[in-house]
């Protein structure tokens, strides 16, 4: 090999080496971070387009990453507060303070509006277990069933449990359909961050034992009308509870996506049109699922191979 040819070869190798150093391949985490940042931009776009106020908390239960919009704002929960009530019901069952098989006889004085099932039952005759009441509370948001459970577990015990978890902004302050209490400002409230924390605490088995945790998640996964669920494919389950009041639409839950479960809490208030709140929740849910589904099925390079 001539000296001139050798010199050209060395120059070429040096050039390739320099290109590699100035343009290194992005690590897998950086690629995913870019996708995560784009998702956050889409969240903000939904928030800016909503004629109302939106609170949002998202948590990747695999990586621990979180994102918030108005994460610490106290917001009305409507029926989403029933997540805290259900958690305390299961906690008291675990502590042998009550049994989920304990029976209750329907009483006429316990019936309130927003109770599609309870209002159709025969007072003084029909017997229901606490588990039956919990199922009605979750599946159809039956307010009479909810009020019976509130009286059975004790509002003060629900709030004491929340205090023990450091969730001081999350409060159960009144029974369902208590318009007098609502008019006095006694609203059932939480923040996106605290509701997310409550759900994660339960999911990770830090409140209930393994058996009770599994039963709780199964109960909260009971099929229901839900904007969060409408943003998911039919084969993806979520342990969630929506809530509705005038000018308020909420939905909070654990999305049980295989390989990449996550928590999503969306709260909307000051709505001019409640349909806009529901639409925003559906959009946020669909966007979040799209991100986590890709991350769950992708290689470190972002290649997704779908099953045939």
Region roles according to the model:
Residues 1-25:
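Bacterial Sec-dependent N-terminal signal peptides
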Residues 22-49, 152-154, 197-226, 233, ...:
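Structured C-terminal helix/loop/strand segments within mature extracytoplasmic catalytic/sensor domains
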Residues 38-71:
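A short, well-structured edge-of-sheet supersecondary motif
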Residues 53, 126, 147-199, 203-204:
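Mid-domain, small-residue-enriched loop/turn segments at the edges of structured enzyme/sensor domains
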Residues 55-59, 67-68, 84, 105, ...:
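Soluble periplasmic/extracytoplasmic beta-strand elements of cell-envelope proteins
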Residues 61, 100-117, 153-154, 219, ...:
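Acidic helix-start/capping segments at beta-turn-to-alpha-helix junctions
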Residues 64, 76-104, 264:
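Active-site SXXK
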Residues 111-147:
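Conserved catalytic neighborhood of penicillin-recognizing serine enzymes
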């Amino acid at each position: 090999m001539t000296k001139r040819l050798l010199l050209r070869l060395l120059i070429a190798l040096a050039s390739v080496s320099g290109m590699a150093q100035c343009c290194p391949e992005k690590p897998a985490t950086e690629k995913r971070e870019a996708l995560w940042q784009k998702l956050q931009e889409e969240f903000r776009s939904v928030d800016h387009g909503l004629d109302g106020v939106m609170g949002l908390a998202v948590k990747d239960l695999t990586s621990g990453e979180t994102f918030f919009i108005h994460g610490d704002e106290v917001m009305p929960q409507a029926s989403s507060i029933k997540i805290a009530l259900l958690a305390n019901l299961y906690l008291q069952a675990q502590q042998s303070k009550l049994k989920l098989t304990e029976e209750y006889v329907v009483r006429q004085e316990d019936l309130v509006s927003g109770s599609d099932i309870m209002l159709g039952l025969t007072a003084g005759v029909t017997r229901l277990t606490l588990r039956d009441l919990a199922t009605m509370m979750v599946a159809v948001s039956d307010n009479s069933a909810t009020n019976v459970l509130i009286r059975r577990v004790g509002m003060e015990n629900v709030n004491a449990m929340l205090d023990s978890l450091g969730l001081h902004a999350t409060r159960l302050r009144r029974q369902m359909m208590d318009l007098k209490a609502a008019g006095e400002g006694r609203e059932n409230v939480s923040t996106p961050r605290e509701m997310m924390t409550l759900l994660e605490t339960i999911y990770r088995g830090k409140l209930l034992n393994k058996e009770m945790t599994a039963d709780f998640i199964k109960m909260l996964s009971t099929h229901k009308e839900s904007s969060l669920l409408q943003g998911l494919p039919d084969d993806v389950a979520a342990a969630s509870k929506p809530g509705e009041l005038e000018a308020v639409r909420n939905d909070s839950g654990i999305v049980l996506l295989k390989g990449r479960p996550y928590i999503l809490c969306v709260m909307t208030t000051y709505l001019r049109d409640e349909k806009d709140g529901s639409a925003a929740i559906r959009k946020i849910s669909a966007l979040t699922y799209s991100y986590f589904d890709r991350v769950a099925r992708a290689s470190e390079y972002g290649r997704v191979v779908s099953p045939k």
